Amino acid sequence: MKRTFQPSNRRRARNHGFRSRMSTRAGRSILAARRRKGRVNLSA
């Protein structure tokens, strides 16, 4: 059986990267929450 996780850096950035987070209101709220928490890395 094929494994479900097939890593790809391009796909990772497209779905979870900083630009994609900034493009939606919900994504911006995620970044704000991570800033508030003091995360070193905000996104992939």
Swiss-Prot record:
This is Large ribosomal subunit protein bL34. Belongs to the bacterial ribosomal protein bL34 family. One of its GO terms (cellular component) is ribonucleoprotein complex. The keyword 4Fe-4S does not apply. PANTHER family: LARGE RIBOSOMAL SUBUNIT PROTEIN BL34M, MITOCHONDRIAL RIBOSOMAL PROTEIN 34 FAMILY MEMBER. The gene is rpmH. Keywords: Ribonucleoprotein, Ribosomal protein. It comes from the Bacteria. One of its GO terms (biological process) is translation. InterPro entries: Ribosomal_bL34, Ribosomal_bL34_CS. PROSITE patterns: RIBOSOMAL_L34. Pfam families: Ribosomal_L34. One of its GO terms (molecular function) is structural constituent of ribosome. The keyword Transmembrane helix does not apply. Residues 1-19, 33-44 have a biased composition (Basic residues). Residues 1-44 are annotated as: Disordered. NCBIfam families: rpmH_bact (TIGR01030).
